[in-house]
Amino acid sequence: MLSGCVSPPGLENDIFFEQADISKDEAPHVANSLEWWYATGWLKDVETGDTFGIEFVMFHFSMNGKKDRLLSNVAITDVSSDKFYFDHTLIGLNDQLKSELPLQLSTARGKSQASIKGQFGEYEFVAKGHHEGEEFSYTLNTVSNSPAVLHGNKSGYENYGGYAKAGYYSYTDLATEGQIMVDGKLRTVKGSIWYDRQWNCGAVLQNRTTGWDWMSISLKESNEKLMLYRLRLREGLNIYGGTLVREDGTYSSLKSEEISIRDKSYWKSKRSGDRYPSKLEISIPNHRLELSLSMLKEEQELAIKILPLVKLYYWEGMCAVSGTRDGEPVTGTSYLEITNPENREK
Protein backbone atom coordinates (compact mmCIF):
# COMPACT_ATOMS: atom_id res chain seq x y z
CA MET A 1 0.00 0.00 0.00
CA LEU A 2 2.87 2.38 0.77
CA SER A 3 4.38 1.79 -2.68
CA GLY A 4 3.20 5.27 -3.63
CA CYS A 5 5.27 7.03 -0.96
CA VAL A 6 7.14 10.07 -2.24
CA SER A 7 10.22 9.30 -0.12
CA PRO A 8 10.56 5.62 0.85
CA PRO A 9 12.19 4.81 4.20
CA GLY A 10 15.91 4.04 4.40
CA LEU A 11 17.18 0.47 4.53
CA GLU A 12 20.32 0.85 6.65
CA ASN A 13 18.75 -0.66 9.78
CA ASP A 14 17.13 -3.71 8.16
CA ILE A 15 18.76 -6.97 9.28
CA PHE A 16 18.35 -10.26 7.43
CA PHE A 17 18.95 -13.83 8.57
CA GLU A 18 18.86 -17.20 6.83
CA GLN A 19 15.81 -18.23 8.88
CA ALA A 20 13.04 -16.23 10.50
CA ASP A 21 12.48 -16.73 14.22
CA ILE A 22 8.84 -16.11 15.12
CA SER A 23 9.69 -15.82 18.82
CA LYS A 24 11.67 -12.68 17.93
CA ASP A 25 10.24 -11.53 14.59
CA GLU A 26 6.70 -11.18 15.92
CA ALA A 27 7.99 -8.14 17.84
CA PRO A 28 8.80 -4.76 16.28
CA HIS A 29 12.20 -4.47 14.60
CA VAL A 30 14.12 -1.43 15.79
CA ALA A 31 14.20 1.39 13.19
CA ASN A 32 12.82 -0.92 10.50
CA SER A 33 12.36 0.53 7.01
CA LEU A 34 8.79 -0.77 6.82
CA GLU A 35 6.97 -3.58 8.61
CA TRP A 36 3.39 -4.48 9.37
CA TRP A 37 0.94 -6.60 11.31
CA TYR A 38 -1.99 -7.26 8.98
CA ALA A 39 -5.37 -8.91 9.51
CA THR A 40 -8.24 -9.50 7.08
CA GLY A 41 -11.24 -11.64 7.85
CA TRP A 42 -14.65 -12.98 6.98
CA LEU A 43 -17.11 -12.87 9.89
CA LYS A 44 -20.80 -13.63 10.44
CA ASP A 45 -23.38 -12.18 12.80
CA VAL A 46 -24.20 -15.08 15.16
CA GLU A 47 -27.91 -14.13 15.21
CA THR A 48 -28.74 -13.02 11.68
CA GLY A 49 -26.02 -14.72 9.64
CA ASP A 50 -25.13 -11.40 7.98
CA THR A 51 -21.60 -11.38 6.54
CA PHE A 52 -18.93 -8.80 7.34
CA GLY A 53 -15.36 -8.31 6.22
CA ILE A 54 -12.74 -6.59 8.35
CA GLU A 55 -9.30 -5.15 7.73
CA PHE A 56 -6.79 -4.15 10.37
CA VAL A 57 -3.22 -3.11 9.64
CA MET A 58 -0.56 -1.49 11.76
CA PHE A 59 2.41 -0.15 9.78
CA HIS A 60 5.68 0.74 11.50
CA PHE A 61 8.40 2.62 9.64
CA SER A 62 11.41 4.79 10.35
CA MET A 63 12.31 7.60 7.94
CA ASN A 64 15.61 8.58 9.55
CA GLY A 65 16.51 5.74 11.92
CA LYS A 66 15.80 7.92 14.97
CA LYS A 67 12.08 8.55 15.26
CA ASP A 68 9.41 6.10 14.21
CA ARG A 69 5.93 6.43 12.77
CA LEU A 70 2.86 4.23 13.08
CA LEU A 71 0.07 4.17 10.51
CA SER A 72 -3.11 2.21 11.13
CA ASN A 73 -5.74 1.36 8.53
CA VAL A 74 -9.07 -0.14 9.58
CA ALA A 75 -12.13 -1.08 7.55
CA ILE A 76 -15.43 -2.95 7.66
CA THR A 77 -17.40 -4.28 4.70
CA ASP A 78 -21.10 -4.75 5.50
CA VAL A 79 -22.22 -7.15 2.78
CA SER A 80 -25.95 -7.22 3.55
CA SER A 81 -26.22 -3.42 3.65
CA ASP A 82 -23.78 -2.95 0.75
CA LYS A 83 -21.70 -0.45 2.75
CA PHE A 84 -17.96 0.05 3.21
CA TYR A 85 -16.35 1.93 6.09
CA PHE A 86 -12.68 2.86 6.47
CA ASP A 87 -10.42 5.15 8.45
CA HIS A 88 -6.71 5.64 9.12
CA THR A 89 -4.45 7.28 11.68
CA LEU A 90 -0.82 8.36 11.24
CA ILE A 91 1.21 9.31 14.30
CA GLY A 92 4.83 10.19 14.95
CA LEU A 93 6.63 8.71 17.95
CA ASN A 94 9.12 10.54 20.14
CA ASP A 95 11.55 7.63 19.99
CA GLN A 96 12.03 4.22 18.41
CA LEU A 97 9.76 1.26 19.06
CA LYS A 98 11.41 -1.36 21.22
CA SER A 99 11.53 -5.03 20.30
CA GLU A 100 9.11 -6.28 22.94
CA LEU A 101 6.40 -8.92 23.27
CA PRO A 102 3.54 -9.30 23.71
CA LEU A 103 2.57 -6.69 21.13
CA GLN A 104 1.02 -3.49 22.41
CA LEU A 105 0.81 -1.17 19.42
CA SER A 106 -1.75 1.61 19.13
CA THR A 107 -2.64 4.80 17.31
CA ALA A 108 -5.07 7.53 18.32
CA ARG A 109 -5.96 10.87 16.81
CA GLY A 110 -9.21 12.67 17.46
CA LYS A 111 -12.01 10.12 17.52
CA SER A 112 -10.05 7.49 15.55
CA GLN A 113 -8.30 4.68 17.41
CA ALA A 114 -6.67 1.35 16.58
CA SER A 115 -4.69 -1.17 18.61
CA ILE A 116 -3.28 -4.68 18.46
CA LYS A 117 -2.31 -6.65 21.56
CA GLY A 118 -1.02 -10.21 21.90
CA GLN A 119 1.35 -12.61 20.18
CA PHE A 120 1.66 -15.86 18.22
CA GLY A 121 -1.93 -16.09 16.96
CA GLU A 122 -3.68 -14.87 20.10
CA TYR A 123 -4.56 -11.23 19.48
CA GLU A 124 -7.01 -8.52 20.35
CA PHE A 125 -7.79 -6.13 17.49
CA VAL A 126 -9.60 -2.93 18.44
CA ALA A 127 -10.70 -0.24 16.00
CA LYS A 128 -12.84 2.86 16.19
CA GLY A 129 -13.25 4.99 13.10
CA HIS A 130 -15.36 7.54 11.30
CA HIS A 131 -16.27 7.40 7.64
CA GLU A 132 -18.35 10.04 5.86
CA GLY A 133 -19.99 11.07 9.13
CA GLU A 134 -20.72 7.54 10.34
CA GLU A 135 -19.03 5.83 13.26
CA PHE A 136 -17.89 2.22 13.11
CA SER A 137 -15.89 -0.01 15.44
CA TYR A 138 -14.88 -3.54 16.33
CA THR A 139 -13.23 -5.51 19.10
CA LEU A 140 -12.07 -8.95 17.97
CA ASN A 141 -10.18 -11.72 19.76
CA THR A 142 -8.40 -14.60 18.05
CA VAL A 143 -6.82 -17.99 18.66
CA SER A 144 -4.96 -19.98 16.02
CA ASN A 145 -6.44 -23.09 14.42
CA SER A 146 -3.13 -23.97 12.74
CA PRO A 147 0.61 -23.28 13.03
CA ALA A 148 2.25 -20.32 11.34
CA VAL A 149 3.20 -20.64 7.66
CA LEU A 150 6.74 -19.48 6.86
CA HIS A 151 6.81 -18.17 3.31
CA GLY A 152 9.89 -18.28 1.09
CA ASN A 153 10.57 -22.04 1.04
CA LYS A 154 9.85 -22.22 4.78
CA SER A 155 12.64 -19.75 5.56
CA GLY A 156 10.30 -16.94 6.56
CA TYR A 157 11.97 -14.66 3.99
CA GLU A 158 10.13 -14.20 0.69
CA ASN A 159 12.42 -13.59 -2.28
CA TYR A 160 10.76 -11.18 -4.70
CA GLY A 161 12.22 -12.06 -8.05
CA GLY A 162 15.82 -12.03 -6.84
CA TYR A 163 15.99 -8.23 -6.39
CA ALA A 164 14.35 -7.81 -2.98
CA LYS A 165 13.67 -9.90 0.10
CA ALA A 166 11.39 -9.38 3.10
CA GLY A 167 10.48 -11.35 6.20
CA TYR A 168 7.05 -12.94 5.89
CA TYR A 169 4.91 -15.45 7.75
CA SER A 170 1.16 -15.94 8.17
CA TYR A 171 -1.45 -17.43 10.43
CA THR A 172 -3.96 -18.44 7.79
CA ASP A 173 -6.89 -19.37 10.04
CA LEU A 174 -7.40 -17.49 13.30
CA ALA A 175 -10.67 -18.43 14.99
CA THR A 176 -12.26 -15.08 15.73
CA GLU A 177 -14.98 -13.83 18.07
CA GLY A 178 -16.04 -10.36 19.07
CA GLN A 179 -18.29 -7.44 18.30
CA ILE A 180 -18.74 -5.10 15.35
CA MET A 181 -20.63 -1.82 15.39
CA VAL A 182 -21.98 -0.38 12.14
CA ASP A 183 -25.06 1.69 11.37
CA GLY A 184 -25.51 2.26 15.10
CA LYS A 185 -25.98 -1.46 15.78
CA LEU A 186 -23.70 -3.66 17.88
CA ARG A 187 -23.31 -7.15 16.42
CA THR A 188 -21.76 -10.29 17.92
CA VAL A 189 -19.70 -12.03 15.25
CA LYS A 190 -17.63 -15.15 14.68
CA GLY A 191 -15.41 -16.22 11.81
CA SER A 192 -11.85 -16.48 10.60
CA ILE A 193 -9.01 -13.98 10.21
CA TRP A 194 -5.93 -14.30 8.02
CA TYR A 195 -2.93 -12.65 9.71
CA ASP A 196 0.22 -11.55 7.89
CA ARG A 197 3.46 -10.47 9.53
CA GLN A 198 6.06 -8.80 7.28
CA TRP A 199 9.22 -6.80 7.93
CA ASN A 200 12.19 -5.34 6.00
CA CYS A 201 9.72 -4.30 3.29
CA GLY A 202 11.44 -1.05 2.34
CA ALA A 203 13.62 -2.93 -0.14
CA VAL A 204 10.57 -3.94 -2.15
CA LEU A 205 9.62 -0.26 -2.54
CA GLN A 206 13.14 1.05 -3.17
CA ASN A 207 13.76 -0.98 -6.28
CA ARG A 208 11.69 -1.51 -9.40
CA THR A 209 8.23 -2.16 -7.97
CA THR A 210 5.44 0.16 -9.11
CA GLY A 211 2.58 -1.71 -7.43
CA TRP A 212 1.27 -5.12 -6.54
CA ASP A 213 -1.74 -7.38 -6.27
CA TRP A 214 -1.82 -9.60 -3.18
CA MET A 215 -4.46 -12.13 -2.29
CA SER A 216 -5.30 -14.67 0.40
CA ILE A 217 -7.58 -17.49 -0.69
CA SER A 218 -9.41 -20.08 1.43
CA LEU A 219 -10.89 -22.99 -0.54
CA LYS A 220 -13.89 -24.64 1.08
CA GLU A 221 -14.12 -28.10 -0.51
CA SER A 222 -10.40 -28.94 -0.48
CA ASN A 223 -9.77 -27.07 2.81
CA GLU A 224 -6.65 -25.43 1.38
CA LYS A 225 -5.16 -21.94 1.65
CA LEU A 226 -3.28 -19.87 -0.90
CA MET A 227 -1.19 -16.74 -0.65
CA LEU A 228 -0.47 -15.25 -4.07
CA TYR A 229 1.05 -12.01 -5.31
CA ARG A 230 1.80 -10.24 -8.56
CA LEU A 231 4.45 -7.51 -8.37
CA ARG A 232 4.45 -5.02 -11.23
CA LEU A 233 7.85 -3.63 -12.22
CA ARG A 234 8.79 -0.35 -13.88
CA GLU A 235 9.93 -2.10 -17.04
CA GLY A 236 6.44 -3.56 -17.51
CA LEU A 237 7.18 -7.06 -16.25
CA ASN A 238 5.39 -9.03 -13.55
CA ILE A 239 6.84 -11.18 -10.77
CA TYR A 240 4.60 -13.85 -9.28
CA GLY A 241 4.92 -15.89 -6.12
CA GLY A 242 3.04 -17.48 -3.28
CA THR A 243 2.47 -20.42 -0.99
CA LEU A 244 0.03 -23.33 -1.14
CA VAL A 245 -1.12 -24.69 2.24
CA ARG A 246 -2.68 -28.17 2.02
CA GLU A 247 -5.44 -29.67 4.15
CA ASP A 248 -2.95 -31.61 6.29
CA GLY A 249 -1.04 -28.42 7.13
CA THR A 250 1.96 -29.07 4.89
CA TYR A 251 2.84 -26.27 2.50
CA SER A 252 5.15 -25.38 -0.34
CA SER A 253 6.25 -22.24 -2.16
CA LEU A 254 5.05 -21.45 -5.66
CA LYS A 255 7.54 -20.22 -8.24
CA SER A 256 6.87 -17.30 -10.55
CA GLU A 257 6.80 -19.50 -13.65
CA GLU A 258 4.15 -21.75 -12.07
CA ILE A 259 1.58 -18.97 -11.70
CA SER A 260 -0.61 -17.12 -14.18
CA ILE A 261 -2.87 -14.26 -13.03
CA ARG A 262 -4.89 -12.47 -15.70
CA ASP A 263 -7.26 -9.51 -15.51
CA LYS A 264 -10.67 -10.35 -16.99
CA SER A 265 -12.72 -7.23 -16.18
CA TYR A 266 -12.27 -3.86 -14.50
CA TRP A 267 -13.98 -1.38 -12.20
CA LYS A 268 -13.20 2.36 -12.26
CA SER A 269 -13.37 4.33 -9.02
CA LYS A 270 -15.27 7.62 -9.10
CA ARG A 271 -13.28 8.83 -6.09
CA SER A 272 -9.74 8.35 -7.43
CA GLY A 273 -10.32 7.71 -11.13
CA ASP A 274 -8.21 4.56 -10.83
CA ARG A 275 -9.15 1.41 -12.68
CA TYR A 276 -8.92 -1.85 -10.72
CA PRO A 277 -9.25 -5.43 -11.98
CA SER A 278 -12.65 -6.61 -10.72
CA LYS A 279 -12.18 -10.21 -11.85
CA LEU A 280 -9.01 -12.28 -12.01
CA GLU A 281 -8.34 -15.68 -13.53
CA ILE A 282 -5.67 -17.70 -11.73
CA SER A 283 -3.98 -20.76 -13.18
CA ILE A 284 -1.45 -22.99 -11.39
CA PRO A 285 -1.22 -26.01 -13.73
CA ASN A 286 1.41 -27.91 -11.70
CA HIS A 287 -1.11 -28.14 -8.87
CA ARG A 288 -4.17 -28.51 -11.10
CA LEU A 289 -5.68 -25.28 -9.81
CA GLU A 290 -7.90 -23.10 -12.01
CA LEU A 291 -9.63 -20.30 -10.11
CA SER A 292 -11.73 -17.23 -10.77
CA LEU A 293 -11.68 -14.40 -8.22
CA SER A 294 -14.35 -11.67 -8.33
CA MET A 295 -14.92 -8.57 -6.20
CA LEU A 296 -17.82 -9.19 -3.83
CA LYS A 297 -18.39 -5.43 -3.71
CA GLU A 298 -16.62 -2.95 -5.99
CA GLU A 299 -16.69 0.00 -3.57
CA GLN A 300 -13.91 -1.20 -1.25
CA GLU A 301 -11.33 1.46 -2.09
CA LEU A 302 -9.43 3.17 0.73
CA ALA A 303 -7.91 6.65 0.76
CA ILE A 304 -4.91 7.37 2.99
CA LYS A 305 -3.64 10.91 3.61
CA ILE A 306 0.12 10.58 4.21
CA LEU A 307 1.03 14.27 3.80
CA PRO A 308 -1.18 17.40 3.58
CA LEU A 309 -1.09 17.30 -0.22
CA VAL A 310 -0.47 13.57 -0.72
CA LYS A 311 -3.39 11.13 -0.72
CA LEU A 312 -2.84 7.48 -1.59
CA TYR A 313 -5.57 5.19 -2.85
CA TYR A 314 -5.64 1.43 -2.83
CA TRP A 315 -8.29 -1.26 -3.09
CA GLU A 316 -8.62 -4.02 -0.53
CA GLY A 317 -11.67 -6.11 0.04
CA MET A 318 -13.69 -9.27 -0.01
CA CYS A 319 -13.78 -11.45 -3.11
CA ALA A 320 -15.63 -14.63 -4.07
CA VAL A 321 -13.71 -17.60 -5.46
CA SER A 322 -14.81 -20.40 -7.78
CA GLY A 323 -13.03 -22.88 -10.01
CA THR A 324 -11.56 -26.37 -9.97
CA ARG A 325 -8.95 -28.29 -7.97
CA ASP A 326 -7.81 -31.58 -9.48
CA GLY A 327 -10.73 -31.23 -11.88
CA GLU A 328 -13.32 -31.02 -9.10
CA PRO A 329 -15.40 -27.87 -8.43
CA VAL A 330 -14.29 -25.64 -5.55
CA THR A 331 -15.53 -22.42 -4.02
CA GLY A 332 -13.95 -20.11 -1.52
CA THR A 333 -13.36 -16.72 0.01
CA SER A 334 -10.58 -14.22 -0.51
CA TYR A 335 -9.18 -10.84 0.41
CA LEU A 336 -7.50 -8.96 -2.44
CA GLU A 337 -5.21 -5.92 -2.22
CA ILE A 338 -4.41 -3.80 -5.29
CA THR A 339 -1.97 -0.87 -5.20
CA ASN A 340 -1.11 1.56 -8.03
CA PRO A 341 -3.56 -0.20 -10.36
CA GLU A 342 -2.74 1.78 -13.51
CA ASN A 343 0.87 0.56 -13.53
CA ARG A 344 0.21 -2.86 -14.98
CA GLU A 345 0.72 -4.86 -18.13
CA LYS A 346 -1.79 -3.99 -20.82
Model segments located where?
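Structured soluble/peripheral alpha/beta segments that form catalytic or ligand/cofactor-binding pockets
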Residues: 6-346
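Bacterial N-terminal signal peptides
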Residues: 1-3
